[in-house]
A protein has these predicted regions:
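Secretory targeting and sorting signals
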Residues: 1-27
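Conserved blade-ending motifs and adjacent loop-strand segments that build the rim/top face
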Residues: 27, 199-200, 451-478
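N-terminal regions that are enriched for targeting/export leaders
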Residues: 27-291, 295-296, 305
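Blade-edge beta-strand/turn elements of extracellular beta-propeller
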Residues: 174-197, 266-279, 329-347, 389-412, ...
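Repeated scaffold domains used in trafficking and secretory/extracellular systems
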Residues: 206-208, 286-291, 344-355, 416-420, ...
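Hydrophobic core segments of beta-strands in well-ordered, beta-rich domains
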Residues: 211, 217-231, 289-315, 353-371, ...
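Beta-propeller blade signature
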Residues: 233-257, 316-332, 377-384, 444-450, ...
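Blade-level signature of beta-propeller repeat domains, shared across WD40, Kelch, NHL, RCC1
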Residues: 472-505
Length: 505
């Protein structure tokens, strides 16, 4: 979650882990930060000892922060404005990876401009006398006012009444053994091989959700994204070229050395476009965050959540609804479906953060409530009816039941956060990865059927080793033995590729 700050910010990027590094966690030995092929310094998300050659950080006087709530009336023109679908085709990247494609937009920083993450503190001498800071904390109070015409209404799908079908548990399977897990490389941001800051004005972003858009090509969608003005320490300010989401493409099949991003959806040269617009108004709609993607034929789909506001309680947020959007031009422009929405009545909606997976005749929807203290529910719908909410069947006590989204039986014991689910055709097993905030681990479960029986968890990444890591989004070209997935790290606010070597059983 975004931490409270003393100025108006985007409050972007959902997913900061609930747990900080435990006091007993031993740091790894210091190592110099990674450097890409252009000599640009990147980020190391691993918990390490400080640089022994660095001078000790100055000690700052303690501060007592006293926020004073100040209501702020915010008029919100309604209905929502139509999306800006301005798009610019991606030009081929330069053959020299260190040459920027748009030096007029942003050129490479000189050596003096290079920045490396470091501890920050006061430059004055230490003092035992605390500094008292009283500051206004503006709390938006949005109210609707008449606006423009907005989007034309969409025809509602014809309501259907699917039957109650049996959905017995599958056979129990053994969890895979874990041979190793390693950090492959930094995918986004300054110092990455993809140089997304120079090529697409993506300095800070998170998530990195994958799906295969067509044979041989994957899409990679990111959450709240920031450009010029972003600084190390979490998500950026609302003035730092904030976009609620962005989309990249890759055909790179050799993942053991990283993933190459070849193009992004652009609204101007070298500038990644926002796909799903948001009002960017706290307590109305702060942002729209993709939660999964999939393709049915030539149509691309995104599940997403409309975030009302981030809570001051770590790991909590309130959504307006979870919804579906689709694209018929390969992901360049998107339409939010006005009817395929799961409203968050009284904050107890079960399918606010959804991971959707086509398999056979159905699309399966794994869902959790807003925040990260909820349980996992499951639904399915025939692929032809994916935009018809009345056609969904929810898994309840061993049956597929229509109109039962609030009654869905939990798939596993315990809480989960931001799911990623994949069916591995070679092994015939389902793979599910998510952050378990109760133990501070990104974990893997497997099953023979989407409704389970799901195995016990296999720990993949610990937040003791990768402080405030979150995510765990599976690359679709993973296998039963080689699981590639992305994680995000809050402080460096960028995406990293991980590789787990598994021993299927």
């Amino acid at each position: 979650m975004r931490r409270p700050v003393p100025h108006a910010t985007a409050l972007g990027a959902v997913f900061v882990v609930l747990l900080t590094v435990p006091a007993q966690a031993a740091p790894f030995p210091w190592a110099p930060p990674p450097v890409n092929m252009c000599g640009e310094t990147g980020f190391d998300p691993l918990y390490r000892e400080p640089d022994p050659a660095a001078p000790p950080a100055p000690v700052a006087a303690p501060t007592i922060d006293i926020p004073i709530p100040v209501p702020q009336l915010i008029p919100v023109p309604m209905p929502d404005p139509p999306p800006d679908n301005t798009r610019v085709a991606q030009a081929p990247l330069p053959s020299d990876p260190c040459r920027n494609p748009c030096p007029d937009v942003r050129d490479s920083p000189g050596p003096a401009a290079e920045t490396v993450a470091s501890a920050q503190g006061s430059t004055g001498s230490a003092s035992a006398v605390p500094r008292i800071q009283i500051r206004p904390e503006y709390e938006p109070m949005p109210f609707p006012v008449p606006g423009g015409e907005g989007e034309p209404p969409q025809a509602a799908p014809v309501p259907v009444k699917p039957p109650v079908d049996p959905g017995p548990l599958g056979a129990a399977v053994a969890p895979p053994g874990l041979e190793s897990v390693r950090l492959v490389e930094q995918v986004t941001g300054h110092g990455s091989r993809n140089r997304t800051d120079m090529r697409w004005q993506v300095d800070g972003t998170d998530l990195g959700l994958f799906w295969e858009t067509e044979p041989g090509r994957v899409a990679m969608v990111f959450g709240d994204t920031f450009g010029a003005g972003w600084v190390y320490g979490g998500a950026g300010a609302d003035t730092a070229d904030w976009r609620s989401n962005t989309l990249a493409y890759s055909t790179d099949r050799v993942l053991d050395d990283g993933i190459d991003i070849e193009a992004m959806v652009q609204d101007s040269p070298c500038h990644a476009a926002e796909l799903l617009g948001s009002r960017k108004i706290k307590n109305w709609e702060t942002t729209t965050i993709p939660t999964s993607g999939f393709a049915l034929g030539d149509r691309q789909f995104l599940s997403y959540m409309s975030v009302n506001h981030w809570s001051k309680v770590p790991g909590m947020w309130l959504t307006n609804y979870g919804g579906l959007a689709y694209s018929d031009d390969g992901g360049q422009t998107w339409t939010k479906d006005q009817h395929a929405r799961w409203e968050n009545l009284f904050g107890v909606g079960r399918f606010q953060v959804a991971a959707m997976v086509p398999h056979g005749e159905y699309v399966y929807m794994f869902g959790t409530p807003n925040g990260r203290i909820g349980v996992i529910g499951l639904a399915r719908v025939r692929a032809d009816d994916v935009l018809n909410k009345t056609a969904y069947q929810y898994w309840v006590d061993g049956n597929w039941v229509p109109a039962a989204e609030y009654s869905a039986t939990p798939l596993v014991h315990g809480i989960a956060s931001e799911l990623s689910v994949r069916f591995d055709a070679e092994s015939g097993r389902w793979q599910m990865v998510y952050l378990d905030p109760a133990v501070g681990q990104i974990v893997l479960r497997t099953a023979a059927e989407p409704q389970g029986r799901w195995t016990e968890t296999v720990p993949l990444v610990s937040t003791q080793d990768y402080p405030r890591a979150y995510g765990g989004f599976i690359h679709p070209w993973s296998t039963a033995r080689d699981l590639y997935f992305t994680v995000s790290a809050w402080d460096s606010y960028n995406v990293y590729l991980m590789h787990a070597r598994l021993d299927p059983r």
